[in-house]
Amino acid sequence: TCVATGTRLHLIEPLGFKINEKALKRAGMDYWDDLDVTTYIDYNDFLEKNPGAKIYMATTKAHQVYTDVKYEPDCYIMFGKESAGIPEEILVEHEEDCMRIPMIGEIRSLNLGNSVAIVLYEALRQQNFAGMNLEGHLHELHWK
């Protein structure tokens, strides 16, 4: 999703997955070389290297829905590990910046990749998909 949208991926350790050639191939990430990615040793490292960053936090614990947020062009959208989410110690300091994707019942959470795509495309929609291809083309035939 990041490669398709020209979005930089910021990874904050410890990661919930391994970044090695075998793991990337298994995940079908043959476009890894095209990915704009930055890795940080921890959350404080991220904050130090991105001073003044506007961060929205995706969490099942939030009060507001992701579509209620007005995303700025250079904001960050943080997602936690699929198994645990963003640590509550971080969430409680940013309650007004937390948002959720609505779900029914007592479902724990959506797949991390799906959640990223849902929220990222809402942020891009609010920016009128700036810089993105808005039209597709047939390869062999022509539209009538």
Regions inferred by a protein language model and the residue ranges of each:
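Post-transcriptional modification and biogenesis factors for structured RNAs
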Residues: T1-K144
